[in-house]
């Protein structure tokens, strides 16, 4: 039962990012990111990472609320463009949903996906098992697992934030 809950949450996670990537207006892009961030926190909490999920929810989504509140105020439109108002945007949204549906059907038929990585033992690295170590709390072990197993995730996230800052500086420069 828990596998299906994680599977449904993962599908909603990807659908939220499909909605974000085909955003026609900044308001709807923010909604897609907030939905995906909340569902991602639910996935983390499902793997008994309650502290990490709560911190991501409070810090990440709290910061996003401020940023998207500011961008929505700066980019207000009288009639914001929705997904169905532009054929190209709607086509990208439908194509993304179709690809996610194909992946879901493939996983339900085959049982696993091993395209670039093998995801069969996902519970082994999401949150460390700390039952044997009585001296460490789950929170400290969770943060250390982020920097040990999730090293490439931290590197990619840092690089993405750097590129985002450069893009924002170029856009605001106006040149």
UniProtKB/Swiss-Prot annotation:
<keyword id="KW-0813">Transport</keyword>
<feature type="transmembrane region" description="Helical">
    <location>
        <begin position="88"/>
        <end position="108"/>
    </location>
</feature>
<comment type="similarity">
    <text>Belongs to the complex I subunit 6 family.</text>
</comment>
<keyword id="KW-0496">Mitochondrion</keyword>
<keyword id="KW-0679">Respiratory chain</keyword>
<keyword id="KW-0999">Mitochondrion inner membrane</keyword>
<keyword id="KW-0472">Membrane</keyword>
<dbReference type="GO" id="GO:0005743">
    <property type="term" value="C:mitochondrial inner membrane"/>
</dbReference>
<feature type="transmembrane region" description="Helical">
    <location>
        <begin position="27"/>
        <end position="47"/>
    </location>
</feature>
<feature type="transmembrane region" description="Helical">
    <location>
        <begin position="1"/>
        <end position="21"/>
    </location>
</feature>
<dbReference type="InterPro" id="IPR001457">
    <property type="entry name" value="NADH_UbQ/plastoQ_OxRdtase_su6"/>
</dbReference>
<dbReference type="InterPro" id="IPR050269">
    <property type="entry name" value="ComplexI_Subunit6"/>
</dbReference>
<keyword id="KW-0249">Electron transport</keyword>
<keyword id="KW-0812">Transmembrane</keyword>
<dbReference type="GO" id="GO:0006120">
    <property type="term" value="P:mitochondrial electron transport, NADH to ubiquinone"/>
</dbReference>
<keyword id="KW-1278">Translocase</keyword>
<dbReference type="InterPro" id="IPR042106">
    <property type="entry name" value="Nuo/plastoQ_OxRdtase_6_NuoJ"/>
</dbReference>
<comment type="function">
    <text>Core subunit of the mitochondrial membrane respiratory chain NADH dehydrogenase (Complex I) which catalyzes electron transfer from NADH through the respiratory chain, using ubiquinone as an electron acceptor. Essential for the catalytic activity and assembly of complex I.</text>
</comment>
<comment type="subunit">
    <text>Core subunit of respiratory chain NADH dehydrogenase (Complex I) which is composed of 45 different subunits.</text>
</comment>
<dbReference type="GO" id="GO:0032981">
    <property type="term" value="P:mitochondrial respiratory chain complex I assembly"/>
</dbReference>
<feature type="transmembrane region" description="Helical">
    <location>
        <begin position="149"/>
        <end position="169"/>
    </location>
</feature>
<keyword id="KW-0520">NAD</keyword>
<feature type="transmembrane region" description="Helical">
    <location>
        <begin position="49"/>
        <end position="69"/>
    </location>
</feature>
<dbReference type="Pfam" id="PF00499">
    <property type="entry name" value="Oxidored_q3"/>
</dbReference>
<protein>
    <recommendedName>
        <fullName>NADH-ubiquinone oxidoreductase chain 6</fullName>
        <ecNumber>7.1.1.2</ecNumber>
    </recommendedName>
</protein>
<keyword id="KW-1133">Transmembrane helix</keyword>
<dbReference type="GO" id="GO:0008137">
    <property type="term" value="F:NADH dehydrogenase (ubiquinone) activity"/>
</dbReference>
